[in-house]
Amino acid sequence: FESFQDISKLSKDLVIENLIESGVWTSFRTRPFSKIPKINDEPEEIFISLISSDPLSLDPEFYLKKHIDDFNFGLEVISYIPKNCVHISTSSNFDLSKITSDKINYHEFDGLHPVGLVGTQIHRISPVSMNKTVWTINYQDVVMIGKLFKSGSLDTSRTVALCGPQVSEPCLMETEIGASISEIS
C-alpha cells in the first residue's frame, strides 16, 4: 500500500480508496443498525470512544500511551471522510496529546457503565435518526489506519485484556485480528 507522510496530500477519495483496498473499511460501523457502511455512503459524523467503563476491559489511555502518534495520524486521515467532524469521547482526566482541528471535536464523560459505550455518547452528542447516519470505529482500528497511511503496511495486531474468573493468570496480550481467544488463553 502507498504511504503518506504528508497528510495534506490526501483527499477524501484517496483515503476511501486506500481503506477499501487494504480491507480496513470494514472497521467502520453505521449507527443506527451497526452495519459495515456501503462504499458510497457518507456519514454526518464519526464517533470514537476512548472511555472504558465495561468491566475487565483494556484501558484505552493505557494502550494509547504507546500508540498516540499513530492514533492521532489515523484521526487526521479519517477526518477526511465525514460531512461534519470526528467526535472523540474521553474521561475528564484523559492526559494524552490531542489534535487541534476544525474536523475533530473532543467530549468529556465521567461515570459508571454504560458511559463508555459509543451509543450512549452518540445519544448525548448528536443523536441519530432514520435520516441521519453516523459511523463508529474502535480506537485500535484508528491506530491501524494511522500505521497504514504512515508506513504503507497493514498492522493487524491487537492488544486484549485476558481476565475474569476462568483465567488463572490475567494479563494484557498482543495478538492479531481474528485470533481465537480459546487458543491463546
Where is each model-derived feature located?
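Buried, small/hydrophobic-residue-enriched core segments of structured protein domains
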Residues: 1-183
